[in-house]
A protein has these predicted regions:
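Membrane-interfacial amphipathic/re-entrant helices at transmembrane-helix boundaries
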Residues: 2-61, 96-104
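Transmembrane helix-bundle core of multi-pass membrane transporters
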Residues: 9-13, 127, 131-193
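Hydrophobic alpha-helical transmembrane segments
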Residues: 20-24, 50, 58, 79-83, ...
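Hydrophobic core segments of alpha-helical transmembrane domains in multi-pass membrane transport
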Residues: 22-35, 64, 110-113, 139-144, ...
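Single transmembrane alpha-helix segments in multi-pass membrane proteins
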Residues: 30-35, 43-95, 122-128
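Membrane-interface helix caps of multi-pass small-molecule transporters
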Residues: 66, 90, 115-126, 149, ...
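Alpha-helical transmembrane segments within multi-pass membrane transporters and channels
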Residues: 96-138
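Membrane-helix/interface signature in polytopic inner-membrane proteins
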Residues: 184-217
Length: 217
């Protein structure tokens, strides 16, 4: 009974003790930096810039977090994001007009990312390749595809797409707001749904989860 309560508690709590300590340390470091470098650090422009840069790594960390909670690891995350960005940039550069081009670029990027994730999942779940080895090989594949698509040169969007990244709502960068929204949605999924509980259980013990009737693949 105690073991069951302990497991349920560990599943439902969003942060363990180590995570809380890490958050406290980061907050203290930010506070100290803000005091010692107040003129350079604590200004609106710098905070907005940090928010924009945090979005990119934050979104990747959300996906990586779910992967690690399930007991795996994904070394190809950065290269998948790179391939998605190149794909979106090429769509925008293809002279697709107006907002339709931006929407199409976003859809293509999401589809490319989903296909890469499905391929990684196939390697791990159905071919039984260890996650580290599978994603170590797939990141080379994604990097090669990115180089071929970009022809080894920089792919950048035009001003239409840059407008979105420069938009702010009450001084908060729009990309950072989207990141917060994704964080809230993923938190609710992982803590309030059966899917989230299954991910935690599979990450804790995949074999026991399989015997419990959970499809670990």
């Amino acid at each position: 009974m105690n073991e069951a309560k302990k497991m349920k508690k560990s599943i439902t709590l969003p942060f363990d003790d180590n995570s809380k300590r890490l958050i406290i340390i980061l907050v203290v470091l930010l506070f100290v930096t803000g005091i010692t470098k107040s003129s350079q650090f604590l200004n609106v422009g710098n905070i907005q810039s940090i928010g924009k840069q945090l979005t990119e790594y934050g979104l990747m960390s959300l996906g990586m977090g779910v992967c690690m909670l399930s007991g795996g690891i994904d070394l190809s995350t950065v290269y998948i994001a790179n391939l998605c960005g190149i794909s979106a940039g090429l769509i925008i550069q293809s002279n697709t007009s107006g907002a339709a081009g931006i929407v199409l670029a976003c859809v293509v990027a999401l589809v490319v990312g989903a296909l890469c994730g499905i391929f990684n999942g196939f390697l791990v779940s159905f071919l039984n390749i260890p996650p580290m080895l599978a994603t170590l090989g797939s990141y080379e594949l994604y990097m090669g595809i990115s180089i071929v698509l970009s022809q080894g040169s920089t792919v950048s969007a035009d001003g239409r797409f840059n407008i979105l990244s420069a938009m702010t709502i009450f001084g908060i960068p729009l990309p950072f707001i989207l990141f917060l929204l994704c964080t809230v949605i993923l938190t609710l999924i992982m803590s309030k749904t059966s899917f989230g509980n299954k991910v935690y259980l599979v990450g804790t013990n995949a074999k026991s989860s399989k015997f419990a009737g959970i499809n670990v693949k």
